[in-house]
From Swiss-Prot:
InterPro entries: RuBisCO, RuBisCO_III, RuBisCO_lsu_C, RuBisCO_lsu_C_sf, RuBisCO_lsu_fd_N, RuBisCO_lsu_N_sf. Substrate binds at residues 161, 278, 310, 347-349, 369-372. GO terms for molecular function: magnesium ion binding; oxidoreductase activity; ribulose-bisphosphate carboxylase activity. Catalyzes the addition of molecular CO(2) and H(2)O to ribulose 1,5-bisphosphate (RuBP), generating two molecules of 3-phosphoglycerate (3-PGA). Functions in an archaeal AMP degradation pathway, together with AMP phosphorylase and R15P isomerase. This is Ribulose bisphosphate carboxylase. It comes from Pyrococcus abyssi (strain GE5 / Orsay). NCBIfam families: PRK04208.1, rubisco_III.
Amino acid sequence: MVSSMKVEWYLDFVDLNYEPGRDELIVEYYFEPNGVSPEEAAGRIASESSIGTWTTLWKLPEMAKRSMAKVFYLEKHGEGYIAKIAYPLTLFEEGSLVQLFSAIAGNVFGMKALKNLRLLDFHPPYEYLRHFKGPQFGVKGIREFMGIKDRPLTATVPKPKMGWSVEEYAEIAYELWSGGIDLLKDDENFTSFPFNRFEERVKKLYRVRDRVEAETGETKEYLINITGPVNVMEKRAELVANEGGQYVMIDIVVAGWSALQYMREVTEDLGLAIHAHRAMHAAFTRNPKHGITMFALAKAARMIGVDQIHTGTAVGKMAGDYEEIKKINDFLLSKWEHIRPVFPVASGGLHPGLMPELIRLFGKDLVIQAGGGVMGHPDGPRAGAKALRDAIDAAIEGLDLEEKAKSSPELKKALDKWGYLKPK
């Protein structure tokens, strides 16, 4: 029994002298209290995300007592505070990102005692991490099946992102692949429509891919968007595998962790890599005071097992500064127990003139996706694709783009149009 007449017990979850055990999961939060002390606010986070309710209870089971989260670090940070909380693994189901996020990123975001709350990072111990497979291929595996050893992979999306018939899409794909693009990608909302059915597109595009591979001697792939209800995604993945595809693309945020974990199993059986699009992430990653960081999102996606994921560019049109993106990319490429490294994808407002700076900032282990910066070339998509490849080759070789453009009319026209513009 809890022999106390006190109503609230949030401070029972705060112990700044506590030393976390090696098998506890650590979560870092930024928060701003609303009418309560920082200690109480931190305790409320720990309580709500572990075993708590708003009041003291008549009885606590022994397991509940041992499962209480503990705030062990609390420091002022700007207008708010940083808290680090240790969670016993008894709180978490093995191998379930869904259950983990329901705890550490669930009801805590709705508490009135907090003006803002942001999940900055989480640190799973090996005892928890070992239940996750991570990527099936990762950077090394993708480089092997693509046959690309020492340069960034190139990707593009036919623009406009919607409105293409299957025949029109196939014609554009032929031009893009022939010009030097490695990966043709559907955009996030391009799935299956009366004017372009998935089943027709998948068959047509892989026939075009096979033709281009025979003509160029290069491996080409199609990041086809299979996103939909889980049963539909599974059927679409099977179609891709039957047509000889190597990749599927999933909008992982809108699909959700449960769907992604299921499709990780499906794609392993089918031998398919997962390209993770992050559409909708900014709804909770963009506000620096509230939500979940892109870093935490990328970490969770790596645990489940995506092979490549969009992270930003720092030089293009999408929000995200260099330090944030570099931190994410470095983590995705780092050694992490048995979990393979993941290819970061740079996309959004890229064109050939930005390649030297992009590669200088983030290195060669990168998928570079340029949509408008390829499709908007004055001489068409094939020329745009070649201009991008030539710009990347120049950057890898340490050549000035203006010098490279002397032997590449496609690159010269791209530079004449966009120069070194950074879109806003």
